[in-house]
A protein has these predicted regions:
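Sequence/fold signature of self-assembling virion shell proteins
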Residues: 2-46, 53, 63-67, 87-93, ...
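Alpha-helical scaffold segments that mediate packing/assembly in large oligomeric complexes
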Residues: 106-200, 328-334
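Long, contiguous amphipathic alpha-helices that act as assembly "spine/axial" helices in icosahedral shell
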Residues: 59-64, 86-152, 203-218, 254, ...
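Short, charged/polar N-terminal "headpieces" of proteins
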Residues: 47-52, 199-201
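Hydrophobic, aromatic-enriched interface-forming segments
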Residues: 182, 186-228
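N-terminal low-complexity, intrinsically disordered segments
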Residues: 56-87
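Glycine-centered small-residue hotspots that permit tight backbone geometry or close packing
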Residues: 74-78, 206, 250-256
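Short, catalytically relevant binding-site loops at active-site mouths
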Residues: 141, 219-223, 260-262
């Protein structure tokens, strides 16, 4: 392979040199990356997952039939024919993300074994966070089915992309209220009554009672654990507890994730002084993750730089499959 000679490829900031990794060793194991990736995922295990591994193509078509109805049968009259125009959900596989490091030979000779663990965990976490962020972004399609994967979930967030996406907040005076930007103040905190109202909206949408989950930001954990109906995960049976699971309320499992999106930052919120984050009440079929290539690890020796190029990558797509099965509760991050 021809040597890479561009200055942008090899700069002090783009490589792991002796100074940056003086106490590590560059052994990267693919299975460790996969383990770290799976451990870091929070949203992905709670939504519908499809595997396209080994299959060609870039679009998945999922049939989405319309529910039929029962009709009264009259004597000597033909049955009622139902001819619904069925629809489908399409998932475009176009999310390709990578994590790369260029590791110099001198580091391999002089470093300690913990570098491998650091890089594998870092790669797994970075890729898992990207997948979770995209699933959270797909929540902008709750209600309508039309979502935006470019909406920011950190930094400057105005909140406008989340309006109308089955998004609510608990108004301190009026209870559960549809969210619009510049409305949430520090007093609009989570309440048990507000959560029950949100559950009722999901019930009214004819969403199955099973396979529901509530994914919350860390700031909401204390309020959830203080509700009368909270049941700690410590009191479950001997089954393995999933990552992030802290308990349940009204039979709905509660998961804590630091990846819960920033809906509106404090600077953009003209009426409040705190960031506004989104907690997701979802049914498993509300969102779908399709993986055409799970986490893959590759290495290539770059002789011209006496270094090893390590890359981990993944290829996937996301979609709002049953948009009526997802709701977002905006809470002040206090």
């Amino acid at each position: 392979m021809a040597g890479e000679t561009s200055g942008a490829f090899f700069t002090a900031n783009a490589t792991v040199d002796k100074t940056a990794a003086a106490t590590f060793v560059p052994e990267i194991w693919s299975d460790e990356v996969i383990a770290a990736y799976q451990k870091s995922l929070k949203m992905a295990p709670l939504v519908k997952t499809m595997t396209m591994s080994g299959n060609k193509g870039d679009v998945i078509h999922i049939p989405k039939p319309t529910r039929g109805s029962a009709n009264a049968k009259a004597e000597a009259v033909a049955v009622t024919m139902q001819a619904n125009l069925e629809s489908e959900t399409t998932i475009t596989i176009n999310r390709h993300y990578e994590y790369s490091r260029l590791i110099e030979d001198i580091v391999e000779v002089q470093a300690l074994a913990s570098l491998r663990q650091f890089y594998t965990e870092d790669a797994g976490y970075a890729l898992a966070k990207q997948v979770d962020d995209d699933l959270f972004r797909a929540g902008t399609g709750f209600g309508s089915g039309t979502f935006d994967l470019t909406v920011p979930v950190t930094g400057t967030c105005t909140g406008t992309a989340w309006e109308g996406a089955n998004t609510y907040f608990v108004d301190a005076s009026n209870g559960l209220t549809a969210y619009t930007d510049d409305t949430v103040v520090a007093a609009d905190v989570f309440t048990d009554a507000g959560f029950r109202a949100l559950i009722k909206l999901m019930d009214d949408a004819d969403v199955p009672m099973t396979d529901r989950a509530f994914v919350i930001p860390p700031a909401l954990r204390s309020a959830i654990m203080g509700t009368e109906r909270y049941v700690s995960a410590d009191f479950r049976d001997g089954a393995t507890v999933q990552s992030g699971l802290i308990g349940s309320v009204y039979g709905i499992d509660i998961y804590v994730s630091s990846n819960c999106p920033l809906i509106e930052d404090a600077t953009s919120n003209s009426v409040g002084t705190a960031d506004v984050r989104g907690a997701y009440l979802i049914h498993k079929d509300a969102l779908v993750l399709a993986e055409q290539m799970s986490v893959r690890s590759q290495t290539q020796y770059k002789q011209e730089y006496l270094s090893t190029l390590y890359t981990a990558d993944t290829l996937y797509g996301v979609q709002a499959h049953r948009p009526e099965g997802g709701f977002i509760l905006c809470v002040p991050d206090v």
